[in-house]
């Protein structure tokens, strides 16, 4: 606050009358004085005493505080310009911790300790002498070698572009069909093991698709340069690789293990491996893996089991209650999974391989539209879709709406592929959920903006996923437990 008497030039004598020659300047001076605080006396009295170190004027020091009000808005009013709500945010965090602590204690009292790390092994192996899922992952190398051999022959002209395209299409189709057939036919493979094997083959499919596209672009550029009578610049930069020198097993397998789906001849590389950074990421991976397993066994499984009877009885009020009860642990586990995969795991792999591009996610939590969320929460997949699906469709004359719909259609197919095949049942809930993102994106973009749009995105994430989980669990329970019991 300070001493107002020393900060303003002291006025002596009386003020000019409003009927005198003061005019607008005098009026402006009165407004400034009123906003500044207490006024001096009409006859040039001394200003009010300076406040003490606590910001209050001395008690009993006089009666100079003739005015204590000024024109101002309440802090919660939008016109106040106040934006520091850190204390309220801390209060929300405290309330969230307390409410979830109560739920955790209630769960322990009701069910006891259900966490069993040994039980997790049975999710991956049904028969200790039969390991079909790891064998499927190892067999994926055959498809990688096949794609490499096709590219080697295309580079030297031993195959025509049409023959190479046909071989690549057959190889890519087999990558998706072969593991699905094994999962559906081999009884000893578990749903979790099937999911991991199919995810490995799906990632390989996307990587080899990109590998084929980029090498094809390089051949076109080389042919175009040759037809124009130009020589390819091989000395553009030191330590860079040009086509076809990139066609080596070392280059291929670096790409297959790198945390990206888009192939390049020269990836950005970090100068060294940071051991402390790598150790932190590995510890995070171990900790969050155990945390996710514990939350699923202790919190989600009992909730899902208790949701079967309301579904069977079609008790809609109880179904909604179970859905909301499942939404909290499901969303918490999904957030932990996001951090575990996109920050801990991918950064650990990138650090080991000195892979320089670490943009695996953007600020999707600030999404004010559904479209922004899908563009920023999974950057490796988003880059692949834009580079190898969206832009090629635009170049072939498709509209932006058609290209965007095509991207969601492909995403819906892979979501259904990764859920229905391991569960050995086809209900299209995942496919429908992904395709529903198109009208949802339009609805949120049309009727919600700013914070309301962000709240709508969060609501769709919190409620949408548990609906799909309950649908699949209910159908799986009916198919594998109720139907055999009824037949018996």
From Swiss-Prot:
Catalytic activity, as annotated: an acyl-CoA + a 1,2-diacyl-sn-glycerol = a triacyl-sn-glycerol + CoA; all-trans-retinol + an acyl-CoA = an all-trans-retinyl ester + CoA; 2-(9Z-octadecenoyl)-glycerol + (9Z)-octadecenoyl-CoA = 1,2-di-(9Z-octadecenoyl)-sn-glycerol + CoA; 1,2-di-(9Z-octadecenoyl)-sn-glycerol + (9Z)-octadecenoyl-CoA = 1,2,3-tri-(9Z-octadecenoyl)-glycerol + CoA
Mutation effect (residue 411 to A/W): Abolished diacylglycerol O-acyltransferase activity
Site (Important for catalytic activity): 416
Active site: 415
Result when mutating residue 404 to L: Decreased diacylglycerol O-acyltransferase activity
Region feature Amphipathic helix (AH), mapped onto this chain: 380-394
Effect of residue 391 to A: Slightly decreased diacylglycerol O-acyltransferase activity
Annotated region described as MBOAT fold, given as residue ranges: 131-488
Segments for region (Intracellular loop 2 (IL2)): 354-399
Residues annotated as binding an acyl-CoA: 374-382, 390, 404, 477
A GO BP annotation: diacylglycerol metabolic process
Recorded topology in the membrane: Multi-pass membrane protein
Function, as annotated: Catalyzes the terminal and only committed step in triacylglycerol synthesis by using diacylglycerol and fatty acyl CoA as substrates. Highly expressed in epithelial cells of the small intestine and its activity is essential for the absorption of dietary fats. In liver, plays a role in esterifying exogenous fatty acids to glycerol, and is required to synthesize fat for storage. Also present in female mammary glands, where it produces fat in the milk. May be involved in VLDL (very low density lipoprotein) assembly. In contrast to DGAT2 it is not essential for survival.
Record protein name field: Diacylglycerol O-acyltransferase 1
Naturally occurring in which organism (per UniProt): Homo sapiens
Gene name of the record: DGAT1
């Amino acid at each position: 606050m300070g001493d107002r008497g020393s900060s303003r030039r002291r006025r002596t004598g009386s003020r000019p009358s409003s009927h005198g020659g003061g005019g607008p300047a005098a009026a402006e001076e009165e407004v400034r004085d009123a906003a500044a605080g207490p006024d001096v006396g009409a006859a040039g009295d001394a200003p009010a005493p300076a406040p003490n170190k606590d910001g209050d004027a001395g008690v009993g020091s006089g009666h100079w505080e003739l005015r204590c009000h000024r024109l101002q808005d309440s802090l919660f009013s939008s016109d106040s310009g106040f934006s520091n709500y850190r204390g309220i945010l801390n209060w929300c965090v405290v309330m969230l911790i307390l409410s979830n602590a109560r739920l955790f204690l209630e769960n322990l009292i009701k069910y006891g300790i259900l966490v069993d790390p040994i039980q997790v092994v049975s999710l991956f192996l049904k028969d200790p002498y039969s390991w079909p899922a790891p064998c499927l992952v190892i067999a994926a190398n055959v498809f990688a070698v096949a794609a490499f051999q096709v590219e080697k022959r295309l580079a030297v002209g031993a195959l025509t572009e049409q023959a190479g395209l046909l071989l690549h299409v057959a190889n890519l189709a087999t990558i998706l069909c072969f593991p699905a057939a094994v999962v559906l036919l081999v009884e000893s493979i578990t749903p979790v093991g099937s999911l991991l094997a199919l995810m490995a083959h799906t990632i390989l499919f996307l990587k080899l698709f990109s590998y084929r596209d980029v090498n094809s672009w390089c051949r076109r550029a080389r042919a175009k340069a040759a037809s124009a009578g130009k020589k390819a610049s091989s000395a553009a930069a030191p330590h860079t690789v040009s086509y076809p020198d990139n066609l080596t097993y070392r280059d291929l397998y670096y790409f297959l293990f790198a945390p990206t789906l888009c192939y390049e001849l020269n990836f950005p590389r970090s100068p060294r491996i940071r051991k402390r950074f790598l150790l932190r990421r590995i510890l995070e991976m171990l900790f969050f893996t155990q945390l996710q397993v514990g939350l699923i066994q202790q919190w989600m499984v009992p909730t899902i089991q208790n949701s079967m009877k309301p579904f069977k009885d079609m008790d809609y009020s109880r179904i909604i209650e179970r859905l909301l009860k499942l939404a909290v642990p499901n969303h918490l586990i999904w957030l932990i999974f996001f951090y575990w995969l996109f920050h801990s795991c991918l950064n650990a792999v990138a650090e080991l391989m000195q892979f320089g591009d670490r943009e695996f996610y953007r600020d999707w939590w600030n999404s004010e539209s559904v479209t922004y969320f899908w563009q920023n929460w999974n950057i490796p997949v988003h880059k692949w879709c834009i580079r190898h699906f969206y832009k090629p469709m635009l170049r072939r004359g498709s509209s932006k709406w058609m290209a965007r719909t095509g991207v969601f259609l492909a995403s819906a197919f892979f979501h259904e592929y990764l859920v229905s095949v391991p569960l050995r049942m086809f209900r299209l809930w995942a496919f429908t959920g992904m395709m529903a993102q198109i009208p949802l994106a339009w609805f949120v973009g049309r009727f919600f903006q700013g914070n309301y749009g962000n709240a709508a995105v969060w609501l769709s994430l919190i409620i949408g996923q548990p609906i799909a989980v309950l649908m699949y669990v209910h159908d799986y329970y009916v198919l594998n437990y109720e139907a055999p019991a009824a037949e018996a």
